[in-house]
């Protein structure tokens, strides 16, 4: 089989399964409204959970800092790309979340890959929730360590896997809020079992940070858990992009020596770091509390209105509210129907989710209004 035959076969298989991914160029993709092909849609596909991507205070911070620092960092943080803006953001994140250190990364994917690649050796074992993000599972499968997956949120199964003899160290990996189902991990129970077996816990809280907990401190703070490694990302609750790893000073020093994604990548622009500092200030303020309260009210309104729909509603109190349809083609048809009625919704299909669980992944944000939720419910009930 030639290279072209191999590529064609893979694409044909995706098409046949109604699983071919496509991108749509949009004029505006974050916030309350999505604009595409000169049409405006209510946007129920964005991760901009607090509606901060268009916050004037954050935009102003980026603009002013671009004038001061320029639009790029100029290099890796190990060469010339670590600015006073990066340092200030790291210090503020560490203080906010109760850690000694924070290290910035260009994306959550890079942060997860870097930590696992740097920390895990052949004699070690990773025990991961089987519904963990692709960045975590891919890094675990590519690492030299043994990978074992426990049944989603099943602490008993996790304990059984941890009890199996391991010549090296064990790392338990999970998410705070799961990206496709929107449900939360029982972090306190997971940490207890992990500590009983002398393991370390790594939590990716991409979808909880900024959105839940006191001052938006996220899933771990809410459940009174402090994992050895906490990954937070800035493309969701913060409304910007990038990520950080929170850890002890010793682990931070170790990652600065061995995390190749950090060492060999150009740092985020200093102006971006300043915008993130402005976003963090909003998240921690009374305005941040108000946005979280508004989002919670919108979620409650939505869940009350979909109880009688012929879909499986995930057990989610988060901004991620998937309606599990099952069949790929039906999910695509429903997404298209919603778009025709002015609601932009994305159909998520295997391999992103398990076979037979294709879904409409609806996301709500603090930028929405109650009438937006009512309109979505109207369309879902076939009255649009």
Swiss-Prot record:
Function: Catalyzes the decarboxylative condensation of pimeloyl-[acyl-carrier protein] and L-alanine to produce 8-amino-7-oxononanoate (AON), [acyl-carrier protein], and carbon dioxide.
Keyword Protein biosynthesis included in the entry's annotation: no
Family per record: Belongs to the class-II pyridoxal-phosphate-dependent aminotransferase family. BioF subfamily.
Subunit structure: Homodimer.
Residues annotated as binding pyridoxal 5'-phosphate: 108-109, 179, 207, 233
Keyword annotations of the record: Biotin biosynthesis, Pyridoxal phosphate, Transferase
Enzyme class label: transferase
Protein name (Swiss-Prot/TrEMBL): 8-amino-7-oxononanoate synthase
InterPro entries: Aminotrans_II_pyridoxalP_BS, Aminotransferase_I/II_large, AON_synthase_class-II, AONS_Archaea/Proteobacteria, AONS_Proteobacteria, PyrdxlP-dep_Trfase, PyrdxlP-dep_Trfase_major, PyrdxlP-dep_Trfase_small
Binding site residues for substrate: 21, 133, 352
GO function terms (MF aspect): 8-amino-7-oxononanoate synthase activity; pyridoxal phosphate binding
Modification type N6-(pyridoxal phosphate)lysine: residues: 236
Keyword check for Transferase: yes
Pathway in which the depicted protein is active: Cofactor biosynthesis; biotin biosynthesis
Originating organism: Escherichia coli O9:H4 (strain HS)
EC number from the UniProt entry: 2.3.1.47
One Gene Ontology biological process: biotin biosynthetic process
Lineage: superkingdom: Bacteria
Pfam families in the cross-refs: Aminotran_1_2
Residues forming coiled coils: none
Necessary cofactors: pyridoxal 5'-phosphate
Catalytic activity: 6-carboxyhexanoyl-[ACP] + L-alanine + H(+) = (8S)-8-amino-7-oxononanoate + holo-[ACP] + CO2
